Structures are given as structure tokens and as C-alpha cells.
Amino acid sequence: MDEREALSRLASTLPGAGDDCAVVGDRVLTTDMLHGTTDFPAGVDRYTAGWRAVGASLSDVAAMGADAQAAVAAYGAPEFDPAEVHDFLRGAREVCDAVGAEYVGGDLDEHGEFTVATTALGRTDDPVRRGGAEPGDAVCVTGAFGRSAAALRAFERGDPGRGNELFRFTPRVAAGVALRPYATAMMDSSDGLARSLHQLVEASDAPDPGMSIEESAVPVADAVAELFDDPDERREAALFFGEDFELVFTVPDDAMEAARAASPTPVSVVGTVDRDGVRTDGEPLPDRGYGHGGAATDGR
């Protein structure tokens, strides 16, 4: 059983499950687990690991349109190098600082491989969930895609400095808050853009929902062109690799310009909500992306 199937089965037993965060009153709460073998390529330093691990949970808070308040992390490793632990905590604190949250503590434990579990807390009276996309809405994204794929390529080429730089990202908390009054549905792109589009369609309350996506409108990170020569690899990096932590959301067409003006992060319109599945340039868009328990996962 892969991650997707396991989560689907668990969600069926938990009322309200399926969004990027759990909602408890006016608070949103999320937790993530990352492992050395699946989430931190060779060359990732502990500063970047701390930044990225805590940032992943803060990105979930952003996807709900919530103000980020606090985060904690549990750090497991076969042994504790004081310098590595210090660098990890520095990364965790600084990514919190970047979004106006507070890093408030955590735990240390011996573990067979480097493993991190993070939890983040946010606050909003009106969270944006995944299920509100309606036909006619614009399909939008923040930022650009393929940065994490480019980071992996840099690590593979023996350039850890560039790889670590690309692997650190700023969670889109400010954009999420700004977009909250306009977005009908929203999530982050941790599983990849293609998979995120399918997830928004699956969650939609509209009858027989779908999306028509214009592939040329998808913003691609400059590092993708820098590190990938093959056009097919560039497409794979932007659409399917995942772990870019951008926001993927829908907005009524008549609110699009106001939403774009409100966001502190550039917003691109990549398509339209319609019916009959997810398509790009008229062809079905494969439902696959990043997943634990087997890297890229295929939806069937």
C-alpha cells in the first residue's frame, strides 16, 4: 500500500479529514514526517533540513489561508552531533522568522536514520478548504515550479551549495492570508502540480468537476532551464516532481484581478475549472506526483 492509498483509507474514518490542516475552532494544525532516505538527498546540510522540514508544515498552514503562529520539531538520528543539531535548530527558527511564526521547541531521540517530525499551528476564522472549486473559476498558482527537482539535479552533479540554496523555500503564508477572501479552494503543491490539480477536482463539491490547464501558462523556475537540457525532463520537473510548496487554488473569474493584486507573491492563471477530469492542452493530465513509499506515484 502506498502513501496515497493509506491516507485515503485513514481519511474515510476521520470526519473532516482531507485538507492540508485539521481545523479546531479558529486554529489549524498540521504534522509532517520526513526521512533521510526519502526526503533529504545526499548533500543536504542540517540547516537546510531544519528549514525545509519545518517549512513543509508551515506551507500546510499557508494552504488554509491561516496566519502561522508556532512550530515544533522532533529530531531523530543515530547519534547527536552538537553542530548538526545547532544548525538544524537555526534553520527551523529562521524559516519560522521568515513567516512571522515562533519556533517553540521539540524533542530529540535516537533513531536508525535521520528522521524529523514537525507540527505547525495557525489561526484563522475562515479557513480555505480544498472542496470549493466551481466551474468557471480560474485555476491559479503562486510562484514557479521545478525548484526542488533542480535542487536534486544540483546535488547529483556534486554542487551541494546550489542544491541547498534551491532546496530552501519560503512558505507562502503571506500569500495564503492575502488570497483567503478570494479563493474558493486551495492547497499546497507538495505532491506536485499535476497531483494537486487532481486532488482539488477530487475534493470539489461540484458535479463531475474537471479542469482545463494550459501547460504553457505554468510558471517554471529559472533553475530548471539552467540544470535540465531535455524538454521532457523540464516538463517532468515542473508538473510531476513535487515538493515545491507553492499554492494551487481556484478563484471566481470576477475576483481574479483583485486576488492577483492582493498577493505579495506573483500569481499565474494556468487554467479553468470545468467538467470531465483534468486535461492539459486537450489531453488527459496523468494523475501522478511525489509520494512516500515509492517516489513518484501514479494515479489509476
Task: Give the location of each predicted region.
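N-terminal glycine-rich phosphate/pyrophosphate-binding loops that anchor nucleotide-derived ligands
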Residues: 1-55, 59-62, 101, 285, ...
